[in-house]
Amino acid sequence: MEPQVTLNVTFKNEIQSFLVSDPENTTWADIEAMVKVSFDLNTIQIKYLDEENEEVSINSQGEYEEALKMAVKQGNQLQMQVHEGHHVVDEAPPPVVGAKRLAARAGKKPLAHYSSLVRVLGSDMKTPEDPAVQSFPLVPCDTDQPQDKPPDWFTSYLETFREQVVNETVEKLEQKLHEKLVLQNPSLGSCPSEVSMPTSEETLFLPENQFSWHIACNNCQRRIVGVRYQCSLCPSYNICEDCEAGPYGHDTNHVLLKLRRPVVGSSEPFCHSKYSTPRLPAALEQVRLQKQVDKNFLKAEKQRLRAEKKQRKAEVKELKKQLKLHRKIHLWNSIHGLQSPKSPLGRPESLLQSNTLMLPLQPCTSVMPMLSAAFVDENLPDGTHLQPGTKFIKHWRMKNTGNVKWSADTKLKFMWGNLTLASTEKKDVLVPCLKAGHVGVVSVEFIAPALEGTYTSHWRLSHKGQQFGPRVWCSIIVDPFPSEESPDNIEKGMISSSKTDDLTCQQEETFLLAKEERQLGEVTEQTEGTAACIPQKAKNVASERELYIPSVDLLTAQDLLSFELLDINIVQELERVPHNTPVDVTPCMSPLPHDSPLIEKPGLGQIEEENEGAGFKALPDSMVSVKRKAENIASVEEAEEDLSGTQFVCETVIRSLTLDAAPDHNPPCRQKSLQMTFALPEGPLGNEKEEIIHIAEEEAVMEEEEDEEDEEEEDELKDEVQSQSSASSEDYIIILPECFDTSRPLGDSMYSSALSQPGLERGAEGKPGVEAGQEPAEAGERLPGGENQPQEHSISDILTTSQTLETVPLIPEVVELPPSLPRSSPCVHHHGSPGVDLPVTIPEVSSVPDQIRGEPRGSSGLVNSRQKSYDHSRHHHGSSIAGGLVKGALSVAASAYKALFAGPPVTAQPIISEDQTAALMAHLFEMGFCDRQLNLRLLKKHNYNILQVVTELLQLNNNDWYSQRY
């Protein structure tokens, strides 16, 4: 909206100000009427002062708009001068002569007086012509009377007629105005009598010369008589003089125009006053409504144009995309030379003509040339039995599932196989020129070899050296001359005779990729009958890649693996021939033929060898009992399993935590002899020491397992395992130790199982009655009857021993194996290893190797030279593992030590030798205490009491950790 302009109008030293807005709301006719009414003038000439203080006349709407533009530049102020014009009264004869000349010249009837009024109203309130003068041409010419003056009777008649027409017109205008006012102000409907009161000379001009406007006051709702105040910005707002003096509900910033009476014509003040009474506000209201309608129309038109513009932009963008796409297609076709006049794919012009105006991007799928095929059916199913030397033709029904017609360059290419061809030189077979979606037959002629056996030949479609589609093959069984076809073989051969038309699984069976061909350069084919290798050069298709082959035709992992095995053992690979089953039931990997003579059924030994890394090995107890016998420690041989570092740590931690839990994963085998020289005291304490010594022996044996990777010993172990296995039973049972019971907290089971078990282990020299591999539960049952070991040293008594020296003892809980489990699963292979030896992966590996049990109190000669060498060889590995573990692992070590050395105190302190000192240092190194000087100083300080040394080291580490963190 334009800014408001103040008009300062001056007339004979009288100045009045008018506040106007844009020229659309307040027109030049409104300004002229307001000026005339304000200064009570009839004929005026308005001039304004421009920038050079020169007077410029205003006589039209355009000049008025220019004046407003000038006022905006002058601070929204416009100085205007009003000059009163002299009204010249037209004399009757000249207009009569002029009117006669007009009538004579035009030959038309002049307008009547009321029509003239209507025309004057439509031309912005211009001064109308004299109606009395125009009425004279209606008088018929009387030849007897002079033409200068009409007769009196005619003049009086016309005056009466004129008054009647004017009254009727004014009444109609008042009625229309009243209807509009009622619509705008419903309160006026209650007083229609006041508004529609019949007008007459007495009501129009009241005494005291007050004019009745026939308009209701917007404030008091009464008819305005006399002075009327109209808002200069809101033409429909009118109030009377009394309301203007008091408060009224309107914007105080709007200037009110004071109107005494409407503008009247100079010749007929009475008629024009009656006419102008209702027309002025009605005209303003109509203009306002029309402008509002125009504004709404313009707004809707702008929105429509804006939407059309957006749509055109989107269309142009889409056309640009399609044009860019067609350019790429044209460039792609021109590069790869598919400009064949017969093929519509080589004509990008036709594509542009047909698809340029298509908004959706549809030509992507139809333009890309794609080679693809699907296997439908065949004539000779896999496993067909033939006589030697039989000449036969293998047919494959193939469907062209791509969008390119097969040409002379499309051939069926030989890949590998040992089935004799009828023509050895013919490695590529022509295929029919199939159109997209058509089905055809591809045939190859073979000759059955002379020797009996299974023969195969693998083929694949190729276009200009680029392979595509599924791999097809022919697999037959050549019988000996005395045909011995059993019903089983016939049934096996006919299992996969039904075929269906599908593509997915058969394409997953594809064996060879063009990429593989480019990398290898040639494919080795080997026939079983001639035993000759015929290298075939594959075509280099890198420079001639013209057609797109979908990814579903690429080779699977099974095919790549089979291709790598092809050069290693072609005979064995040729026996693993998949059946030509229909594509919807083809297995994901090639099945083995039921009658293959070269592939043995994988036995327990192979399965055991494959599962050896995962650690899931066990044996049924029937085989274990065969090998279980009392063997002397001094006469056993070495046969150890190779373990990785991670498995060794897992096993060591589990063994240190669970001495009574589960069997070893190795079968009972010959054991390593250990030479140890020490004196064992008699009694329960001696048995406990003896068990600890056996634990040290076990760790030495474990070191031997890790260091000696002898293939002969591994084979011997495997043979031993296989000899104990059963052909009918290949189930594996894994008994997890007590520490894996997730329903119990770690404090209940983890450390309690780390205690010694003197009732379960014996030295082989003095007590050969109890086998080394016996289960803890069984040993507990046998001890009271068959052994002299006291009952109070059973596992229950050991479990009830406090593991932390001050806490409440544990409640003994000995769980026997269920009857369904083996009575004695694969037993341990060391005397001192009753714990679990399963390499089960543990989420948090404890840093407590079971070498910590090598130095109990009261033992005189505990560690031999082999233990020393083992500790030295392992301490670097143990320190590297313990260096990455957290404080919780150290607390586990301390708790295990407390549980280990919770036995009865010994008064006599043994003399510590240099080897024993080195062993203690190695223990500390494996637990992560790598400060040699500090360890040696603490050992001397605590008189080689490793429990006190570990406790003080833990306190030092905790203090250092807190000081560094906080």
UniProtKB/Swiss-Prot annotation:
Self-association and partners: Homooligomer and heterooligomer. Interacts with TRIM55. Interacts with titin/TTN. Interacts with RNF29, USP8, MAP1LC3A, MAP1LC3B, MAP1LC3C, GABARAP, GABARAPL1 and GABARAPL2. Binds to ubiquitin and ubiquitinated proteins. Interacts with SQSTM1. Interacts with TAX1BP1. Interacts with IRF3; this interaction mediates autophagic degradation of IRF3. Interacts with IL12A and IL12B. (Microbial infection) Interacts with Influenza A virus protein PB1; this interaction promotes NBR1-mediated selective autophagic degradation of MAVS.
PB1 domain mapped to chain residues: 4-85
SUPFAM superfamilies: CAD & PB1 domains, RING/U-box, UBA-like
Record-listed Phosphothreonine modification sites: 586
Name listed for the protein in its UniProt record: Next to BRCA1 gene 1 protein
Domain notes: The PB1 domain mediates interaction with SQSTM1.
Biological processes per GO annotation: macroautophagy; negative regulation of osteoblast differentiation; regulation of bone mineralization; regulation of stress-activated MAPK cascade
Effect noted on mutating residue 50 to R: Loss of interaction with SQSTM1
Main location, first listed in the record: cytoplasm
A GO molecular-function descriptor: zinc ion binding
Pfam families linked: N_BRCA1_IG, PB1, UBA_NBR1_C, ZZ
Superkingdom classification of source: Eukaryota
Keywords associated with the record: Cytoplasm, Cytoplasmic vesicle, Host-virus interaction, Lysosome, Metal-binding, Phosphoprotein, Ubl conjugation, Zinc, Zinc-finger
Matches recorded under InterPro entries: Ig-like_fold, N_BRCA1_central, PB1-like, PB1_dom, PB1_NBR1, UBA, UBA-like_sf, UBA_NBR1_C
Gene: NBR1
Compositionally biased region (Acidic residues): 699-718
Phenotype when changing residue 928 to A: About 2-fold weaker interaction with ubiquitin than WT
UniProt region (ATG8 family protein-binding), positions on chain: 542-636, 727-738
Residues that bind Zn(2+) 2: 231, 234, 250, 254
Lineage of producing organism: Eukaryota, Metazoa, Chordata, Craniata, Vertebrata
UniProt-annotated stretches for the region Disordered: 699-728, 750-792, 848-879
Cellular component per GO, a single term: mitochondrial intermembrane space
Modifications after synthesis and translation: (Microbial infection) Cleaved by S.pyogenes SpeB protease; leading to its degradation. Degradation by SpeB prevents autophagy, promoting to S.pyogenes intracellular replication.
Record's note on what induces expression: Upon viral infection.
